[in-house]
Amino acid sequence: MATEVRAQLAERSLPSPKGELKLEKKSGCQPRSHGDSGPQKELMIPGIVDFKLIREAVRTSKPQTPSAYRFGRLSHHSFFSRHHPQPQHVTHIQDLTGKPVCVVRDELSLPTISVPVGDPQSNRDPRLYSEAWKKELKDLASRVAIFTKESELKSKEKEEPQREQGAKYSAETGRLIPASTWAMARRHSHQGRNQPASRDEGDQTFVLQDQELLILELLSQILQTDSLNAIQFWLLYAPAKEKDMALGLLQTAVAQLLPQPLVPIPAEKLLNQLLEVQDSLQERHQLPYSQSPKKMKTPPLSKSEKPENIGKAQVLRVHSSQNPEEKAAKAEG
């Protein structure tokens, strides 16, 4: 019993925290005097840590010093970096008299552009774009030219066996050339064409330029545009299938523009024409030396001019109509 009584007395003697809180609240509710203008600190409960108050205390800014900026911090603009003293860019050197002279290193004050504006590759080589589309156009023109040459060679190979059976007619000389001599002449002409390759290089460049212009014009018709930029963009970025389709159209168009091969003439018809030409040439050569048959008509001969038949021979007496006196005068003279 004694121990229980002592425990109860000890509990009554200790002040309860609830009672203290009530007293603190009552004291906080009392009206403030007009003289207390300073901020009142909040009462802290022992054993309890308020993290919100700690964060707010950390966030509170330090009191500004007199050297702080009046209207906030200055920006990093080149004007402020130039007109605000900076020890990194401002130094002092001595002049001839030994006095310090202020020197400003403003190379780093202004912003510099290290990378060119726009596409760096186009700025490094401005002709890159033009050379690229010209190369594509040249490749397209060469493919079309190769196709046309192959088609011409195939057509010639088909025609040559039929023509080489008979003789060839030369329009320059107007004569027939045998097949053997024609083949030899063709071989010599092919060898001569292969040898002067350096002379034909200039002509080939002109031909290639003409082909490129022709293909450029045909492309404008195929793509249905008059804009050179659109054609350049198509040459650079068009897919392979689309280019193949355009190549087929270009090949057919160029094949139609090329002159068609001559139709071969049959051998019999050619010989008849040659005979007619030769006859007409012979008549033209004979006309100056001999008169035509219409002009050959002469008046009938007189009896004195007609030849006399003596046996099987015909004898013509010359000057038979002259008098004997005239004959004697001629003899004396």
From Swiss-Prot:
Biased composition annotated in UniProt, kind: Basic and acidic residues: 324-333
Keyword set includes Chloroplast: no
Residues spanning the signal sequence: none
Taxonomic superkingdom: Eukaryota
UniProt key word Manganese: no
Subcellular location: Cytoplasm, Cytosol
Coiled coil segments of this chain: none
Keywords, ordered alphabetically: Cytoplasm, Developmental protein, Differentiation, Spermatogenesis
Main location class: cytoplasm
UniProt cross-references to Pfam families, sorted A to Z: SPATIAL (PF15256)
Residues covered by region (Disordered): 1-42, 284-333
Stored InterPro entries: TBATA-like (IPR037394)
Family as reported in the entry's similarity comment: Belongs to the TBATA family.
Role played: May play a role in spermatid differentiation. Modulates thymic stromal cell proliferation and thymus function.
UniProt name for this protein: Protein TBATA
Natural source organism: Bos taurus (Bovine)
Gene name for this UniProt entry: TBATA
